[in-house]
Amino acid sequence: MSLSLQERGEVFELWVSSYFEQVMSLDLVTTPFLAARNVNRDPSKLRTLERMSKDELDGTMDHGVFARSSSILLRVVPEVLYANCLRALVDTEGVWRDVDVLLLWCDESMHDCLWASKFVAELARAPPAEGKQKRQIEVERLEGANHFVSTTPHYRTYRT
């Protein structure tokens, strides 16, 4: 049985707003680890979309945004994207040379968020290229949160 495009979108929205089993360290994040990781079934960890009223959802969700903005990322040449990531996150010789990076990663977030966080954490630990000064990158864990801002009280984010 296959799902329509709309049904796939609905399933994706529920999956992406889920809380997953907690990850204590980004060092644990590997492909097999993520493949074996499950949605957290604790009743207090109800999916974000299941906790929001219809009015809240209608006021915050834009189902057409993917087609307008994010889908272009699927067509980017990976080498170009990687070079741009390095330039933005590490290079202090370009624009905003005095800007530091603070990555907040959520330990119950979906797999892609953890993988990206691990990537940035590895950049932070890597030595600078020869003759280069590297941007300061800090990586902090938000405990008990998924990647939806509404699930983490704002004071916790500001305090971190």
Descriptions of predicted regions:
Residues 1-118:
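Alpha/beta-hydrolase
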Residues 15, 158-160:
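Short amphipathic C-terminal alpha-helix that caps PH/PH-like domains
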Residues 110, 114-135:
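Active-site-adjacent alpha-helix of alpha/beta-hydrolase-fold enzymes
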Residues 139-158:
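Catalytic histidine-centered segment of alpha/beta-hydrolase-like enzymes
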